[in-house]
Amino acid sequence: MQTFLKGKRVGYWLSEKKVKKLNFQAFAELCRKRGIEVVQLNLSRPIEEQGPLDVIIHKLTDVILEADQNDSQSLELVHRFQEYIDAHPETIVLDPLPAIRTLLDRSKSYELIRKIEAYMKDDRICSPPFMELTSLCGEDTMRLLEQNGLAFPFICKTRVAHGTNSHEMAIVFNQEGLNAIQPPCVVQNFINHNAVLYKVFVVGESYTVVQRPSLKNFSAGTSDRESIFFNSHNVSKPESSSVLTELDKIEGVFERPSDEVIRELSRALRQALGVSLFGIDIIINNQTGQHAVIDVNAFPGYEGVSEFFTDLLNHIATVLQGQSTGGAATEEVAPLRHNRLLAEPAGSLAGERTCSASPGCCGSMKGQDTPWKTETEAGNMGAGASAKLPHQRLGCTTGVSPSFQQHCVASLATKASSQ
C-alpha cells in the first residue's frame, strides 16, 4: 500500500440514486483499506466544516442545471461548492464545474470535438456536422442547414445533455418533419453505422469500451418517411430489442474502433477540459470506416465496467502522488493495461486489433498549446448484445496534473459565472 495515501480525505457528493446504482459504499470501503478516509458531503452545511479534503468527487449536474434556471437553493449550493474550491486550490476536484457546464451543453461539447478533430488531422476521425436551432423553423432554416453541411436524414437532440429529456430524440427525413422540432435543440447529421454504438467509459488514464445496440441504417437523402421519435437510453440498453435496432443487412464497413484513436480522443478531451470522469459515444461510419463522436457525457453510469472502483482509486492515487511530488509522478507514461474480456459470442467485434501509429495524432501535443481554447481563454489571449472491449490505460497522464485542473478552473471561471 502506498504510504502517502494514509490520512488522505476524499469527499463526495452524488445523488442517492447514483450512490445506489454504483454501490459507492463499496468504493468507500476499498479506499479505507488503503488508508483513505471517505466523507459524504452535505452541501446544506458549510464544506469548510467537513474538511480538510484532498479530493472531491461529485456529480452536480442536476444542481448546476437547476442553478442555471435561477433556482435559489441550487444557486446557493453551487456557490458554496465553488467558494470552497476557490479557498482551497490544493483540493483536487473530479471534475471542475466549468468543464461540467461545457459537457452539459451539446452545442458547446460538439464544437469542442470539432476543434479537437481539426487539430488532430487524423483521417480516421470525422464526426457529423451539427447546428443549433434556437427558434422555430422558418423560411431560412433549410438554407442554414445546408450552409452548416446538414442533409436529410438528421437527428435532433435537446441542447441539454443531462436528465431524462436529454434521451428524447428524433430522426427527421424531410422538410415537413422540421415542423415537429422543438427548440432549443441541436441537429446532427445521421451517419449509418450498422446499428452498433461504442460507449467509451474514461476514468483518468484508463478507459473501457462497451458495445451497445444502436439505430439501424437509413437511406441517405430526403424521403417521405415520417419523423421517428425515440428514447436513446432505451434503444441502447444492453438488452434492447427494438425495430429501430434490427439491422436489415450489414452494409459497407463493419469493424470495431481503433484503440489508438480512442486513446488520443480521450487524452485530448482531458487536456482541453481537465476532466477525468466522462463517457464518449462513438460510431463507425459504415461507408468510410471513420470514427464519429456523437456525444460526450459527464460522469456516466459506467455500466459494464467491472474495474470502475479500482480505476478510480488508482487515478486518485496518481493525482495525489503527483501533487505530493510536485507533479513529477504524472510525467511518466503509463503502460497500456488490458482486462480480461467478458464472455462473448464467437465472431464478436471485441477481438483486439493493433493499429499503426499515426504521426498526425495528438500524441505530439505534449508541450504545445492546444488550439481549442475556450471562449474565455481566447478573449484573454485575444448491436443487440452488450460486449466489453479491451480495457486500456491512456498513454499519457500529464493532462490531469493538479496544476492543470486548477488552470482549467481559472481559465473557465468567467465563462461559467456568466451562464
UniProtKB/Swiss-Prot annotation:
PROSITE patterns: ATP_GRASP. One of its GO terms (molecular function) is hydrolase activity. InterPro entries: ATP-grasp (IPR011761), Inositol_tetrakis-P_1-kinase (IPR008656), InsP(3)kin_ATP-grasp (IPR040464), ITPK1_N (IPR041429). PANTHER family: INOSITOL-TETRAKISPHOSPHATE 1-KINASE. This is Inositol-tetrakisphosphate 1-kinase. It comes from the Eukaryota. Its EC number is 2.7.1.134, 2.7.1.159. GO terms for biological process: inositol trisphosphate metabolic process; necroptotic process; neural tube development. It is an enzyme of class 2 (transferase). It holds the Pfam family Ins134_P3_kin_N. It comes from Mus musculus. Belongs to the ITPK1 family. The modification N6-acetyllysine is found at K388, K415. The lineage of its organism: Eukaryota, Metazoa, Chordata, Craniata, Vertebrata. The gene is Itpk1. Monomer. Interacts with GPS1/COPS1. ATP binds at residues 106, 157, 188-199, 214, 232, 236. Keywords: Acetylation, ATP-binding, Hydrolase, Isomerase, Kinase, Magnesium, Metal-binding, Nucleotide-binding, Phosphoprotein, Transferase. Its cofactor is Mg(2+). Residues 117-334 form the ATP-grasp domain. 1D-myo-inositol 1,3,4-trisphosphate binds at K18, H167, K199, N297. The modification Phosphoserine is found at S401. Kinase that can phosphorylate various inositol polyphosphate such as Ins(3,4,5,6)P4 or Ins(1,3,4)P3. Phosphorylates Ins(3,4,5,6)P4 at position 1 to form Ins(1,3,4,5,6)P5. This reaction is thought to have regulatory importance, since Ins(3,4,5,6)P4 is an inhibitor of plasma membrane Ca(2+)-activated Cl(-) channels, while Ins(1,3,4,5,6)P5 is not. Also phosphorylates Ins(1,3,4)P3 on O-5 and O-6 to form Ins(1,3,4,6)P4, an essential molecule in the hexakisphosphate (InsP6) pathway.
